[in-house]
């Protein structure tokens, strides 16, 4: 006997009721994406670790602390995907999809991060992911943000979220800003948290994303990135804001927003909520024009975002309409074949049907009631002989002796 039959810490079973909610969220989001021209694709859950190291940066929290990476039996370093974008870009390059640009791609599935489990944050969780490859110009940023807003509206949570927006500018802007930021932070080097002291040498902009109270006090007076934007970067961001205003999208500019991954440039954004405590981010993303060059020496303008399905499910209790099955109960073994024929014909008419031939009839009826079913069909000797059925409506407790055609009419 196995001593511990619990799932791994930070990983949960998705039971049928959970899956109904997940599928509802996925289908709603997918349908909105289809209206924008997005097509679904998937990549393997496992990739070579170098794919994520190269894309996300060694100094990112995901790579330095959270990635599930190990050596397989062929001595390859492989990893469970911690996000979708790296795998999508790898697939884009390895499948030679450059001639198909622009591409709008939707993916969904589990991702994995070794993090401290808490409400809204698990080590295995599920995401909705949208990537727009070949997305050039601020207008595509605006369209992507409109897609995100429309998805949140379809899921009935848009009013409970706030769009926080920032511009990281171009690479020239960030180089100048990073120098100024390091100069400022060096004056507080001894006061920074241990983690930020390491980041100061590797990726100082990531300190702006620190959750440490000590760091936050220091960051409060740090230089502002937008003050060092080139004219090109300023023009790009101003154009985006103009489009958002035209589209009626409300936003709040957060000059400290940098996102947690190294591949972003220009536009970065988060949709946050007050309903989930510390796990405030529901949907987030940004522009990553340099990522395809980092991976495969190709220049592809791109923007995308991901949303956490578990967090969306925590925000709203969805009243999902579930079609209840019809239960067919044969009375006596000699009527099982007739019952199987009835079930088969019901399914041919797209009616969810379950046959339950085992056990005493009272216990079988109780199982039906436990499933909150609405209808039972009894098949006994008399019904078989007369080629009809005993149909019971559990809501009004009425029984009818009718043929299959009449049953089909009642169930449609």
From Swiss-Prot:
One of its GO terms (molecular function) is histidine-tRNA ligase activity. It is found in: Cytoplasm. PANTHER family: HISTIDINE--TRNA LIGASE, MITOCHONDRIAL-RELATED (PTHR43707:SF1), HISTIDYL-TRNA SYNTHETASE (PTHR43707). GO terms for cellular component: cytoplasm. HAMAP family: His_tRNA_synth. It holds the Pfam family tRNA-synt_His. The keyword Transcription regulation does not apply. The keyword Cytoplasm applies. Keywords: Aminoacyl-tRNA synthetase, ATP-binding, Cytoplasm, Ligase, Nucleotide-binding, Protein biosynthesis. Homodimer. It catalyses: tRNA(His) + L-histidine + ATP = L-histidyl-tRNA(His) + AMP + diphosphate + H(+). Gene3D superfamilies: Anticodon-binding domain (3.40.50.800), Bira Bifunctional Protein, Domain 2 (3.30.930.10). Coiled coil: none annotated. This is Histidine--tRNA ligase. Belongs to the class-II aminoacyl-tRNA synthetase family. InterPro entries: aa-tRNA-synth_II, aa-tRNA-synth_II/BPL/LPL, Anticodon-bd, Anticodon-bd_dom_sf, His-tRNA-ligase, HisRS-like_core, HisRS/HisZ, HisRS_anticodon. Its EC number is 6.1.1.21. GO terms for biological process: histidyl-tRNA aminoacylation.
